[in-house]
């Protein structure tokens, strides 16, 4: 019983440590969501949570919204076959 509990705890920890991160992307244009206030940013946090769920976090990194704590299948920038108007 203790072994099963330890295995379950380890699997939960691995899922937390290896959570996906990436730039928030507009699926129609392929462009990143831009931001100008670097670091903690209410806009990025709100947009990341809206697109990826309440567990997601977000902040402004290199003038783009960077989302954290995403599920593994989350779609992030860059998108295949989407060039963001050549940018």
From Swiss-Prot:
Sequence similarity: Belongs to the long (4 C-C) scorpion toxin superfamily. Sodium channel inhibitor family. Beta subfamily.
GO BP field: defense response
Keywords: Amidation, Disulfide bond, Ion channel impairing toxin, Neurotoxin, Secreted, Signal, Toxin, Voltage-gated sodium channel impairing toxin
Main location class: secreted
The protein's role, per its UniProt record: Beta toxins bind voltage-independently at site-4 of sodium channels (Nav) and shift the voltage of activation toward more negative potentials thereby affecting sodium channel activation and promoting spontaneous and repetitive firing. This toxin affects the activation mechanism of sodium channels of squid axon. It also competes with Cn2 in rat brain synaptosomes. Is lethal to mice.
Asparagine amide: residues carrying this PTM: 85
Compartments it resides in: Secreted
First and last residue of the signal peptide: 1-19
Protein name as it appears in the record: Beta-toxin Cn4
Example of a GO cellular component annotation carried by this entry: extracellular region
GO molecular function: sodium channel inhibitor activity; toxin activity
Keyword Membrane in record: no
Tissues expressing the protein: Expressed by the venom gland.
Disulfide linkage: 31-84, 35-60, 44-65, 48-67
KW Secreted (keyword) present: yes
PROSITE patterns to which the protein is assigned, alphabetical: LCN_CSAB (PS51863)
Domain LCN-type CS-alpha/beta: 20-85
UniProt domain comment: Has the structural arrangement of an alpha-helix connected to antiparallel beta-sheets by disulfide bonds (CS-alpha/beta).
